[in-house]
């Protein structure tokens, strides 16, 4: 059984752009857009990669301190019947996965984020927010 809901897994596979956050050696947060990630069912983790990935700051940060967060989000256009008078014409949805991370070089450079906290919004329903801690004992190895 995955730490992600079926709806969260489906959403992870549809995103076009995400952001990965890491912490630099001086403690400064670093956030960068990424376009290549996937759920790794063998580890129930999120694998992130990209061009020349082992030469990126995010890769070096994870190699040094073993922590990362990925956020995948977007806006969903509302049907005119769903809109409140004077309200927004779209609503946010997304998922944030925080956790321990590995900087992997073989078979290709990537960051593997092992979830410790998952927060999703607007995925299961327009108004539902799902935030939970994930115990290390639930990770697949």
Segments from the language model and where they lie:
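Short, basic/aromatic recognition patches
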Residues: 1-19
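A generic structural signal for short beta-strands and their flanking turns/coil linkers
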Residues: 14-18, 32, 42-44, 64-68, ...
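Short, acidic, Ser/Thr-enriched surface-loop or helix-capping motifs
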Residues: 23-26, 96
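Hydrophobic/aromatic beta-strand elements that line small-molecule binding cavities or substrate pockets
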Residues: 34-37, 99-100
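A short mixed-secondary-structure module that forms the rim of ligand-binding clefts
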Residues: 36-78
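C-terminal edge-of-domain segments
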Residues: 89-92, 96, 100-141
């Amino acid at each position: 059984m995955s730490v992600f809901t079926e709806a969260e897994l489906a959403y992870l596979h549809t995103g076009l752009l995400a952001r990965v956050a890491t912490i630099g050696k001086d403690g400064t947060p670093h956030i960068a857009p990424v376009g290549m990630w996937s759920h790794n069912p063998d580890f129930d983790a999120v694998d992130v990669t990209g061009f020349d990935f082992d030469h990126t700051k995010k890769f070096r940060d994870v190699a040094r301190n073993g922590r990362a967060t990925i956020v995948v989000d977007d806006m969903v256009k509302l049907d005119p019947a769903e809109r409140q008078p004077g309200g927004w014409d779209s609503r946010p949805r997304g998922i944030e996965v925080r956790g321990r991370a590995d900087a992997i070089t073989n078979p290709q450079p990537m960051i593997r984020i092992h979830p410790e906290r998952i927060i999703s919004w607007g995925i299961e329903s327009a108004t539902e927010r799902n935030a939970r801690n994930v115990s290390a004992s639930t990770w697949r190895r």
